[in-house]
Structures are given as C-alpha cells and as structure tokens.
Amino acid sequence: MAYSSFELLDHSRPILIFGRDGQVGKALQTCLKDLKAPVVFLGRSDCDLSSESSITEVLNRYQPQVIINAAAYTAVDKAEDIAEHDLAFAINAKAPALMARYIANVSHGILVHYSTDYVFADTKQTAYFESDSTGPVDSLCVYGQSKLTGEQAIEEAFNLASDSCHASYQDKFSRYFILRTSWVYGDGGNFIRTMLRLAAERDQLKVVADQVGVPTSAQWLAEIGLQMVGSRVGSGIYHAVPDGETSWHGLAVFAIETAASYGEGIEIRSENIHPIPATEYPLPAKRPYNSRLNNQKLKKALSDMAFTGQYPHWRTQVEQYVIDFVESSLKS
C-alpha cells in the first residue's frame, strides 16, 4: 500500500507515532518511509509514557493532528507483580487517555490506538463482536485490565469533546480508532520465531492446544491503521484480525512445517509437536482460552473506503512471514 498523502491532514503538523521499536512500530516505519508529510517516531528514550509531564511536553512540542499509539506495556506476566501494576496502568491506560484528550480537541484530529483480545474473559465460545461486553474486570489479568481501562479512557475523552462541540463544527470532529487484535508477530521476538528456534534445537515440543485465536501480522496491522487514518469512516472499536482461527499448537505446526518445506534446518516431525492443555504450562497471568475476534465490522469499513485489496487469511500471512524469515536467516 502507498501512503503518499492523506487528504484531510494539515501537512504542517506531523503524524506522531509512539512505539517506534515495537513490532507494529517497525512496520509503520516501513509503510511510511515514502510519505510526503512529516512523521515523528518516538521510542522510550524520546518520551516516557509513564510520565504525564513527558507526554504533555511531547504533545505540546509537536502539536500533531494524528497520533498512532503502537506502544504498550506488554510484559503480561510481569504485570501481575504488585510492584508493576502502576507502570502497566500508566502506559496502557493513562498515556492513551492523555493522547485522546489532546487529539479530541484538534480539528480533524485522529487517534489510532492498538488494543488486545485480553479485554475479554471467556464469556463466550465464538468470536467476539465489538459490541460484546468486555471483562468482567476481576476475571482479567492486570495487562487486560490496563488495556481495557485505556480503551474506556479514549472513548470518554472523545465523548466529552463531542458533547462540548457546537453542532456547526461537526464536520471538523476528531476521530478515534481502537484496533483490537491478537497474537501479533513481526520484526522482533514473537511466538513464531520462538517455535522455529526450538524446532531447530529439539526433537520433541509441547505446545498449548486449548487456547484459540487469530495470528496477526504486524505489517498488516500497520497498513490497517494507516487505512483508517486516510479514511472517512466513523470512530469506534474495530477488531483487526485476518480470517480464520487456530490454536497455539496449530500455529506452531503450520509455521514449522512451512519452514521445513523451504529448506530451514528443522528435523522435528509434526507428530512430535505434542498438544497440551494450558494447565500443563502454568503462567502468572491468566490468558483467555477464546481469543477469537469477529472482523466483519472492519471488513465493512474497508469496503466503504473502496478498499480493493484481498482480505487475508492468517495462513497466507504466516506462510509469507516464515518464508521471508527463512530466506533472511539463510543470507545471514
């Protein structure tokens, strides 16, 4: 996808992107390398997202019209430590709230915020719609609670700004897009790379098979976020995942078989990748068993944008990711 311009943007104001060094942040850098508009990528050394004063200083300095928040506290298990609670909530809830309060009062302002399947707590066995109830909060891990609080803070900030605006300024309303996703992989440490490494080192693997979700490409997530920036679709929560579903075990088998078929030095056989229940691999933070997210709302939005690209299946994206990873490994 090409992003040479965005119709409604004031090109004297930069697009501000938090989370430069994460998987989605790196993908955004690739997507925007040829953009004919100012873009500022911020990492931890540029802005302390646990500090209100640091965030406020950055917003006042750059005065962006668009913010893409690809940053998050993602140490899911570490967040269960009482000493980490405040940091998780500062980065995942308070920081997005500050961004939202700022952008909500900018003419044609846009906030893209990436969220997670962890806001759901196994209240159904089919794919969640955006309208489904989240939580209950006491059934979520701390990471999930902090991300849910961030979502709610964004919605509240934009609702307050909308209520305070005169009707004649409706055409200048700012918008927000909360993109919930799951099982992200890209340029960086992730489940797929871990499985490929272990498959090259071991002749037996055990992988959780009773947690189901949708593997999602960071590159595709970056492209979807930018599609929303360039669109006229309405504010709201959108489930940004490809088609299909699988378990962690299913993903591991598919990725390993794909790598083996393309010449990677993997000897492990599929029958030696053993499915296990999550109870056999206990972790401090509770993970959802059902991470399925219904993507029909996003598909409708893309259709309204006259988006002509083919909506992907997770297998297609994972296959290409593994092929690219194998080829880069062979070159190095």
Locate each region found by the language model:
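SDR active-site strand-loop-helix element
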Residues: 18, 42, 70-71, 111-117, ...
